[in-house]
Amino acid sequence: MQDSSLNNYANHKNFILMLIILFLMEFARGMYILSYINFLPTVTSIAVAITSLAFSIHFIADASTNFVIGFLLKKFGTKIVLTTGFILAFTSLFLVIWFPASPFVIIFSAMMLGIAVSPIWVIMLSSVEEDKRGKQMGYVYFSWLLGLLVGMVFMNLLIKVHPTRFAFMMSLVVLIAWILYYFVDVKLTNYNTRPVKAQLRQIVDVTKRHLLLFPGILLQGAAIAALVPILPTYATKVINVSTIEYTVAIIIGGIGCAVSMLFLSKLIDNRSRNFMYGVILSGFILYMILIFTLSMIVNIHIVWIIALAIGLMYGILLPAWNTFMARFIKSDEQEETWGVFNSIQGFGSMIGPLFGGLITQFTNDLNNTFYFSALIFLVLAVFYGSYFIANREKAK
């Protein structure tokens, strides 16, 4: 009994420390990717094309690394992989201090940061306890969201004081996360040193076994990300509100998401499979309705209400979807499978803005992008609703 209590305490301590490390790394990512490089064209000689390229390369590096990181963790161990990641992130962001307007450094740092964050995410997802998955995944996604948003806002404020003087803060945050890592005992589901060919075969095998999940993983991210390029224009040109009022809508949605992740996500634990199915299906249908409704709304107060509803639903849909995916994963392939899933999700987030921007540009109508996003959620609702009904019938 005492050994069990000590083991539970150690697992809880490790989980909390990893949450803090994830928060700090996402904080650094928010500072650099969402704030610093976006402001560079306005305060230095860096061209917008360079910062746009850096932004894209960051997420390409992230998605590509996710695809193989689980296998690298199993082959080389967590200490080598994570330490390498921290070195890459710290060194690249440290270079920004000395070369704040170098195109090569800006792009290189974005790529290295994308690689460095990947193993932390995979370890977090694979270390979640099954009987507490909903609750703990709520904490994981909350740490991610809070880190990104607070990092972005914090860097925005520092840039207003001076555009480049506080660049050292980004590498400092990574250094703190790196130090905290040495107080964590990270364990994998198993270790193996299989040859590269065998690992490639396993990637193909993992992919084939989880094809059912890929539409949901890919299209959810694409549907949400498709709206990103048009939302500022929608706010200022269609609703005719200021940037501040638009920012308030984002904050309200973020607060709703945070509340849901912290308090509602635990509802997923110890509930029936049908309850989880209901949450996922309701989430897809509600998203379809709310996004379609946005195309007809010109009142900012109603937009705020919709933003709150979207945030609340997102905060419980993510843990529910994560729990659904977890049921398909073999216990000894957690790291590899979550890595592949994250890679597919990252690819969806990359193609979403591309489609959203192109639809608006070629049709010259913002509403068509809202229709596109809503249609994706309708397709997901029909596809997985059919699966849930069929699976429920089989279980009887």
From Swiss-Prot:
Domain of life the protein comes from: Bacteria
PROSITE patterns associated with the record: MFS
GO BP, sorted A to Z: lipid transport; lipoteichoic acid biosynthetic process
Function: Proton-coupled antiporter flippase that catalyzes the translocation, from the inner to the outer leaflet of the cell membrane, of the lipid-linked disaccharide (anchor-LLD) that anchors lipoteichoic acids (LTA) to the cell membrane.
Protein name: Proton-coupled antiporter flippase LtaA
Location within or outside the cell: Cell membrane
First-listed, main subcellular location of the protein, grouped into a coarse class: membrane
Entries under Pfam families matching the protein: MFS_1
Keyword DNA-binding recorded: no
Family, as annotated: Belongs to the major facilitator superfamily. LtaA family.
Lipid bilayer topology: Multi-pass membrane protein
Pathway where it operates: Cell wall biogenesis; lipoteichoic acid biosynthesis
InterPro entries noted in UniProt: ATG22/LtaA_families (IPR050495), MFS (IPR011701), MFS_dom (IPR020846), MFS_trans_sf (IPR036259)
The organism's taxonomic lineage, starting at the top: Bacteria, Bacillati, Bacillota, Bacilli, Bacillales
GO molecular function, one term: antiporter activity
Regions crossing the membrane: 15-34, 46-73, 80-99, 105-126, 138-159, 165-184, 211-231, 243-264, 276-298, 304-326, 338-358, 370-390
Keyword presence, Nuclease: no
Keywords, alphabetical: Antiport, Cell membrane, Lipid transport, Membrane, Transmembrane, Transmembrane helix, Transport, Virulence
SUPFAM superfamilies tied to this protein: MFS general substrate transporter
GO CC terms in record: plasma membrane
